[in-house]
Amino acid sequence: MNNFKFIIINFIFYTMCFMQVAQPYPPLNLVSVPTAGTLPRGSFTFESLITKNGGIIPKLCVGFTDNFSFGVSYGIQSLIGNNKPFVNKTTPEVQIKYRVFDESEKMPAIVYGLDTQGRGIYRDSIISFQDTVMINRYDQKAWGLYMVVSKNWNLLGNLGLHIGFNKSLGENDDGDNDFNFFFGFDKELNRSFSLLLEYDAAFNDNFFKVNNQLNELTFGRGKGYL
């Protein structure tokens, strides 16, 4: 098992290093918040997001046209560490982006998208007060359906502003299916480094029908994610 972990981690690491040579601009995402950036036709990216408790979410995305991209991801928990790795789901999650308006000098770019990949562990149910509560959700919900508007300016290097709304699709068993709001920006420092900042308001995660912390999980706190 340790050899398997070593092989997977090294594959992800070296692939990420290789892909950074031709990273598209503007970025497809900030840290987790989507932008209106899409992949050029015929190009692809492979990236991984490291999550808490040794989890990794590798994602492959392909640009089918300049305005349409499709990706798949697969959450693996406890890949880093001594615990036995396990997957969130037996099937991969999907990411779809379609840019309906290209950015111009005066107007921002607008993208409609779908992202079913949440953050953290996916749980079908939890135990609360000796009762089984069905939740069917990630620790941090997936974006689901979303719309994002992006505008870039050349201000001593690129400055990008990104604002969007989203609605979860399949993670509403907690009784909270509100629309959500997010925003972020990226500031190019030089050709190799950029400053990224994002905020997810988590309006769709500020209520839970059992109304407690549930095994120290963060469900229902509604404080947002910075």
At which residue positions do the language-model features occur?
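Outer membrane beta-barrel transmembrane domains
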Residues: 184-188, 192-226
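Outer-membrane beta-barrel biogenesis signature
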Residues: 18-47
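Transmembrane beta-strands of outer-membrane beta-barrel proteins
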Residues: 28-29, 47-49, 61, 69-75, ...
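Outer-membrane beta-barrel strand-turn architecture
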Residues: 40, 52, 64-68, 76, ...
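Residues on the lipid-exposed face of transmembrane beta-strands in outer-membrane beta-barrel proteins
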Residues: 46, 58-62, 72, 94-98, ...
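Residues that define the transmembrane beta-barrel architecture of outer-membrane proteins
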Residues: 40, 52-58, 87-94, 139-145, ...
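Outer-membrane beta-barrel architecture
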Residues: 39-45, 57, 69, 105-111, ...
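Outer-membrane pore/translocation modules
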Residues: 22-24, 74-177
